[in-house]
A protein has these predicted regions:
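Hydrophobic core
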Residues: 12-17
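Sec/Tat signal peptide C-region and signal peptidase I cleavage site
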Residues: 18-24
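Amphipathic, charged alpha-helical segments and their helix-to-coil junctions
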Residues: 25-68, 72-75, 86-122
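Contiguous, amphipathic alpha-helical segments that mediate oligomerization or scaffolding
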Residues: 81-82
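Cleavable N-terminal signal peptides
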Residues: 10-11, 22
Length: 122
């Protein structure tokens, strides 16, 4: 489990994607490009990190642009989680929940995180 968490952190925190092919570079570039948009949406309280390792709207839905950011980020996260799960021979849910714990830990003060199914500001 510690090995998997270390691998997950390396993949997502440093951007050192281990997914073979140019597809990995595409994912990395897309995720990097979305960082400012995600940061702004978090800062404004529109989205937060849910307890399953994905972005979610705190109060329903956002505007079409925010919806697109969340949808594409979550799709890319799922791809990364699936690769790690396959490599580590665990479920995607295990990888995602480990990442959720890390994201909650590193969330900035004032950002929303999901705890026990409820949104709370860190």
């Amino acid at each position: 489990m510690k090995k998997m968490l270390a691998l997950l952190s390396a993949v997502l925190m440093t951007g050192a994607f281990l997914i073979p092919s140019a597809h990995a570079q595409d994912i990395r570039a897309r995720m990097k490009q979305r960082i400012p948009q995600i940061a702004e949406l978090k800062k404004s309280g529109v989205i937060g990190e849910d307890s399953k390792g994905y972005l979610a709207f705190v109060n329903g839905k956002g505007n079409p642009q925010a919806d697109a950011v969340v949808k594409t980020e979550n799709a890319d996260r799922k791809t990364v989680y699936a690769y790690i799960a396959k490599k580590e021979n665990v479920s995607v849910d295990v990888v995602a929940s480990q990442r959720a714990a890390k994201l909650a830990q590193i969330a900035k003060s004032g950002e929303y995180i999901q705890k026990n199914g409820k949104w709370v500001r860190k």
